[in-house]
Amino acid sequence: MADMQNLVERLERAVGRLEAVSHTSDMHCGYGDSPSKGAVPYVQAFDSLLANPVAEYLKMSKEIGGDVQKHAEMVHTGLKLERALLATASQCQQPAGNKLSDLLAPISEQIQEVITFREKNRGSKFFNHLSAVSESIQALGWVALAAKPGPFVKEMNDAAMFYTNRVLKEYRDVDKKHVDWVRAYLSIWTELQAYIKEFHTTGLAWSKTGPVAKELSGLPSGPSVGSGPPPPPPGPPPPPISTSSGSDDSASRSALFAQINQGESITHALKHVSDDMKTHKNPALKAQSGPVRSGPKPFSAPKPQTSPSPKPATKKEPALLELEGKKWRVENQENVSNLVIDDTELKQVAYIYKCVNTTLQIKGKINSITVDNCKKLGLVFDDVVGIVEIINSRDVKVQVMGKVPTISINKTDGCHAYLSKNSLDCEIVSAKSSEMNVLIPTEGGDFNEFPVPEQFKTLWNGQKLVTTVTEIAG
């Protein structure tokens, strides 16, 4: 219920922002100015994008329902906020510096809402759908780029495809609406790329005339419900600077420079220090001297007297090892060395998340295994008919006893993959990872270790780019 309440509150805040956007007056030239029917072509083109691929994405998300639909509503809010910014840019000149950041803040906040939703729903059966959206929603930030935003959107689209490919693999022969959902979602970003190329090739096209867009409050000119109290009145002016102090400092500096300008003759005023005047030669001087005086402390602004508030203890998530539908969830296990899953079926998958210093054995034949955000994990399994994926992890060791067609390593530092004799034809697919090693069994029962290449060389051969592994001589 608490999660549902949080979701409702987030949606209410987003709706409030949109309502405020639609009511802001023209004289403020604010973020939410609604253009007239005669909107500039690039606003009309964005409306077309909302009415076609975005509408289809919302329709398919509603058919799937659940977390996918909730996520889509958040994405839709972000796109409508972006549309409001485009309408403002078509009527106003670009503000400078912090003022522009204020205009972009609602979009940035909505992007973070979308990402946070995925993080809070890692146990969702639609986790791959949520991840595809979460990894690519930052494409809405193209409006903040000063040059060539199109390639940035393409990069975000490619990030989404890493997860949409999983959705296709899981649902292609099971439920066609998930395939249509993937097609609709990716088309948003491909059409946005074409839109940017046509209207905003070198960045968001602001109006050359009209007033400068002012600081975005996202609120009507009058007070609104939920607005904070007025700011406190300014404090008293600072006391006048003492002129005598300034003259004293000036005189001191003049005297100092006069001494420096003496050059080597300044040493003539120095007095010889005999041994009986040195504390390390005459211990009696130490007893006579008082406490050592420290030099003047550098100036620091006075700090307000506030009582330190204790930091809230980090909430530790409960450890899980359970079968939820067709998914084995192994989460938040720490310092456990005897975890075993032995009642497996071919259609089941395993999702291993945030396990630290833990060993897990999966017996029997299973569809796929995903290792996400784990450290010092040891995984032993018999047979996997699909893929074993290691993501966002560190120091992971996996060993196949039977057969596996593919092992994918992504954003991982330190991964050892021990293959069996029956899995020597396994494909190792890696990206953004380091310290990867594949261990091949020998006749004597030992393993030979082979590092996976991490450094490459790319050349243009006149027609295409050719990439080869770079051999580094030891």
UniProtKB/Swiss-Prot annotation:
UniProt lists the family membership as follows: Belongs to the CAP family.
Q: Where is this region: Disordered?
A: 215-253, 277-316
Q: Which domain of life is it from?
A: Eukaryota
Phosphoserine modifications at: S34, S289, S294, S300, S307, S309
Sites where N6-acetyllysine occurs are at K80
Q: How is the quaternary structure described?
A: Homodimer. Binds actin monomers.
Tell me which stretches of the chain form a coiled coil.
Answer: none
Q: Which Gene3D superfamilies match?
A: 2.160.20.70, Adenylate cyclase-associated CAP, N-terminal domain
Q: Where is the signal peptide?
A: none
**SMART domains under this entry?**
CARP
- In the record, N-acetylalanine modifications are located at A2
Here the segments flagged for biased composition (Pro residues) are 228-241, 299-311
- Give the UniProt subcellular location, in the record's own words: Cell membrane
Gene Ontology biological process terms in this record: actin cytoskeleton organization; ameboidal-type cell migration; cell morphogenesis; modification of postsynaptic actin cytoskeleton; receptor-mediated endocytosis
Q: Which residues carry this modification: N6-methyllysine?
A: K286
Looking at the record, the residues that make up the C-CAP/cofactor C-like domain are: 312-452
Organism of this sequence: Mus musculus
Residues that bear Phosphothreonine: T306
Known PANTHER family for this protein? ADENYLYL CYCLASE-ASSOCIATED PROTEIN (PTHR10652), ADENYLYL CYCLASE-ASSOCIATED PROTEIN 1 (PTHR10652:SF1)
Q: Where is the composition biased (Low complexity)?
A: 217-227
Tissue note: Ubiquitous.
Indicate what this protein is called per its UniProt record: Adenylyl cyclase-associated protein 1
Q: What does this protein do?
A: Directly regulates filament dynamics and has been implicated in a number of complex developmental and morphological processes, including mRNA localization and the establishment of cell polarity.
